[in-house]
Amino acid sequence: MNADEAIVERWVERTLTSYPAETLPFLSGEQDPFRNPVGHTLRKSLATLAQELLGSMDKNRIAEALDALVRMRAVQSFSPADAVRFVFGLRAVMQETSGTVPESLQSRIDELALMAFDQYMSCREQIFELRVNELRSRMRYAVSGEEETE
C-alpha cells in the first residue's frame, strides 16, 4: 500500500466512525457495492477527493465525488456539522501519517469543507421541497376527495 492509499484508508476509517457502532463491521467489511452502497460510495468518493486534494484539484471531479457523498449524508439526516466533518478528518489523517499538513493543503481542505456545506444545504433544501410538495399533493387529494363525496 502506497502513502496515498494509506491516507485514503485512514480517512475512510475515520469517516466510518460517524456511523452507529453496530453498523461499522458491515460498512467497513462488505465490499459489494450493491449490498453496501454506503460503504462503496464513501470509499470511492473519499479516494477521488484525496486524489484531487493532493493533486490537480479538478473541480468537476471534486464536485461529482462530493455530491455523491454529501447527498447520501443529507438523506441520512446528519446535522450540517456532522455531515461535513469528514472533510476535516483529512487534516488529522495527514498530521498522523506525515507529521505535517502543508498550508496549501489546509487551504484546499477548508475550501472543500465550504463546498461540502453548500452541497449539504442544497440537498436538505431539495428534501424539504419534496416533503412540502408531497404534503400539498396529499392535501389537494384529501380536499378533492371530500368534495366528490358531498
Where are these regions (language model features)?
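Generic preference for hydrophobic/aromatic residues in regular secondary structure cores
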Residues: 71, 86-87, 109
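Core of compact, soluble alpha-helical bundle domains
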Residues: 1-68, 99-150
